[in-house]
A protein has these predicted regions:
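Conserved metal-phosphate-binding beta-hairpin within the catalytic cores
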Residues: 209
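Extracytoplasmic cell-surface/polysaccharide-interacting catalytic and binding patches
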Residues: 1-85, 89-203, 216-234
Length: 234
């Protein structure tokens, strides 16, 4: 059985530090991802009827190429399923509101400061004036794995967009429950391929990867971001 490197915990997500990184947008265009045998497309927020979500998955040109490369680094039986890419501010706000409801439902006695801190772990604040949300740049992509023979999306140990500790990318490395063994392996495969293709991952979401934006610069050590806010027109 092939073994894959464990998922190492990265430095903590720090929006204040990320916001300080300079942006020199290179003007690279957005493009619509195309379906292929190694990449499955599920425009999740459009399917959930979130107002403003588009029926397409859109990324910067280089990000799309790197995603295609990442798919070739997977075992032959697996492919990448893409849930989201470029995202307008109205959808970002809708998602922040939805995640807030999840957190409040689980922690009804929590105060506002604690809730906001938890929110920042799982969804960027669209109302910040010192930076744009990563998905608005076209440099962020949300992905998982699927089995090419069946089309089945693989178990990753927590659901996409689930706001909880098991969604932390490295969380399963410390879990002893045998039921999570397969999911742990799946995360190792996903993270390994995406990082090898040039992406960085935020530590609070196993599904979220970046290239070219401030998140990527922060986690990769680059001195600047090459993608700022991008705008899409059908």
């Amino acid at each position: 059985m092939t073994t894959y490197p464990i998922v190492q915990a990265t430095k903590p997500l720090n929006w204040q530090a990320i916001a300080q990184i300079a942006v020199h947008d290179n003007g690279e265009p957005l493009l619509v991802l195309s379906l292929c045998s190694r990449i499955q497309l599920i425009p999740t927020y459009f399917n959930q009827h979130i107002s403003g979500a588009i029926n397409a998955l859109v990324l910067r040109q280089t990000v799309a190429k790197k995603l295609q490369h990442a798919a070739t680094l997977l075992p032959d039986t697996l492919g990448l399923v893409v849930f989201d890419g470029w995202r307008p501010l109205c959808v970002q706000q809708a998602l922040r509101d939805e995640i807030r409801q999840q957190i409040v439902a689980k922690h009804p006695k929590a105060d506002e400061v604690w809730i906001e801190a938890r929110l920042d772990e799982f969804v960027a604040n669209p109302n910040r004036h010192d930076m744009c949300p990563p998905h608005l740049t076209g440099g962020s992509v949300d992905v998982s794995l699927f089995h090419r023979a069946t089309g089945e999306v693989l178990d990753m140990g927590s659901a996409f967009d689930e706001a909880g500790h098991l969604s932390y990318t490295a969380a399963l490395e410390n879990e002893t429950d045998a039921r999570l063994d397969a999911a742990r392996q799946h995360r190792r495969i996903l993270v390994g391929a995406m990082v090898q293709a040039g992406f960085t991952n935020i530590p609070t979401e196993w599904w979220h990867f970046d290239f070219g934006n401030q998140n990527w610069a922060y986690f990769s050590g680059a001195d600047r971001a090459i993608y700022g806010a991008a705008h899409w027109q059908d």
